[in-house]
Amino acid sequence: MQGLGALFLLLTACLTLKADNVPTLPDIQVQENFNEARIYGKWFNLAVGSTCPWLRRIKNKMSVSTLVLQEGATEAEISVTSTQWRKGVCEEISGVYQKTDIDGKFLYHKSKWNATLESYVVHTNYDEYAIFLTKKFSHRHGPTITAKLYGREPQLRDSLLQEFREVALSVGIPENSIVFMADRGECVPGDREVESTSFARARRAVLPQENEGSGSEPLITGTLKKEDSCQLNYSEGPCLGMQQKYYYNGASMACETFQYGGCLGNGNNFASEKECLQTCRTIAACNLPIVQGPCRAFAELWAFDAAQGKCIQFIYGGCKGNGNKFYSEKECKEYCGVPGDGYEELTRS
């Protein structure tokens, strides 16, 4: 197989793209005297390059993952298990790849998109690194090619990184579509990632200014940014006013109301639910259920439907919802990583 199961997942993302300007795929030669038994075991996916245009859009979300290759249930199969961070959660994905009459070449057929993937082990010394190339053929959308670099350890020699770059370029992958991924460490399936403040701020910044809540200035001064206050408990302050405000509840991942006295307090204090969500919501909200709430307002909003893997419209009642609530389709896609059909496949390594 192109054993590295991640390859087919990247390629299927391009099934929704037109094949305009995609070059004819080159012939690929497998590793000379390929030894299948020696390719088994654990690998780290360290770099990727592809003619699939979606890669450039989501490359900053990709990180080093692990992949284990083993003998399959039959002599004609190879078992593949990939573990990676995706949308803040550690996921484990398993697959089966079919051997061919060429040692080092493997097939995977994705019936949902009527696409066949051909994967090739093109360079490896088995004990240190491996480079895979995968062709994807779609009857509707034409061909794409993806290259991936794997290592037995999370770091490799610079000369091997350069070799991978040269291989990718040689098959028509653009320089700006070659990504050496960040190492966030190994994960255990089901674990949730602790999102750093700087990463969260950078992610939220993708929303254009006109889509963000206007809101008021922070209620306290100093070096603390508004978004850094999101994990604080709400504070009514010492004054005796009765202003309804919103605060972000990290436990429920929702913005809830409280009575603000009118002075002091802290930065977890927002004039509207929209401003609160657009300041404090994290990518974990995309995994929450879609909740209309018990109130009877009629607001047409957007939410991410995890079952369908896309953003959909729903009617929000106006109260007691959660963070999976967006004020435009664009905002939903920016947060939940849905630039187009097939995005989910692309983000899996």
Curated annotation (Swiss-Prot):
One of its GO terms (cellular component) is mitochondrial inner membrane. Glycans are attached at residues 114, 214, 233. The precursor is proteolytically processed into separately functioning proteins. Keywords: Cell membrane, Chromophore, Cleavage on pair of basic residues, Cytoplasm, Disulfide bond, Endoplasmic reticulum, Extracellular matrix, Glycoprotein, Membrane, Mitochondrion, Mitochondrion inner membrane, Nucleus, Oxidoreductase, Protease inhibitor, Proteoglycan, Repeat, Secreted, Serine protease inhibitor, Signal. The record marks 296-297 as: Inhibitory (P1) (trypsin). PROSITE patterns: BPTI_KUNITZ_1, BPTI_KUNITZ_2, LIPOCALIN. SMART domains: KU. Expressed by the liver and secreted in plasma. Its EC number is 1.6.2.-. GO terms for biological process: protein catabolic process. In the N-terminal section; belongs to the calycin superfamily. Lipocalin family. This is Protein AMBP. The gene is Ambp.
